[in-house]
Amino acid sequence: MTHLNSGLGTSKVTAETVNGYVKITVVAGSQPVTQYYVAKPNDPAIYMATYLTGEINPGELRFLARLRRSAVPNGWHGDAAVLDGCTAFEGKDTFKCPNGQTRCKMYTADRFIEDQVHGVTGKNVGIWMIMPGTAYETSSGGPFMRDINTQSGDDQELYWYMNSGHVRTEDWRFGLHGPYAMQFT
């Protein structure tokens, strides 16, 4: 299952075939955002772009894939966000583990300037978020901003944050976020 933010509510969804490619457009009914998906025959990737014309609620813009953890159990940065046996003590974001460690999905973050590929893996499989340098041009926070990449709970969560509400350093930037892709290997 994938979604943008925590969902876009009632949306207008259209699908069409353009020169052999499948293009899906999702226009949010209550948010100033349009999400595009493109799939090409025999290409193991879903190409995406997000067009934003104003601030959204809740105050962050992210793509999230909730994946079957049994297929892709390995998150980004090792055990940094593996929550097995751990107990939440700060909302649902920070956990204390029986061995005394703390775990948090924030620990999987990389600076945007260095984060062009991150993903999750399993036996003979990987699922990767690929963000070329241009994908971050409209992201707020600048090149040294960072945000969540993965979290391993009941599901394996794979994120791409475009505008973060976690540590907001400037006004949001609007326009096209992307292109970016979710690649299956």
Listing of model-derived features with the role each one plays in the protein:
Residues 21, 36-37, 47, 51, ...:
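Sequence-level detector for tyrosine residue identity
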Residues 26-28, 176-184:
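Short, hydrophobic/aromatic-enriched beta-strand segments in well-ordered soluble domains
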Residues 38, 42-83:
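Acidic (Asp/Glu-rich), glycine- and aromatic
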Residues 63, 127-129, 185:
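Generic hydrophobic, helix-prone segments enriched in Leu/Val/Ile
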Residues 68-176:
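A contiguous, surface-exposed recognition patch within enzymatic or periplasmic domains that forms
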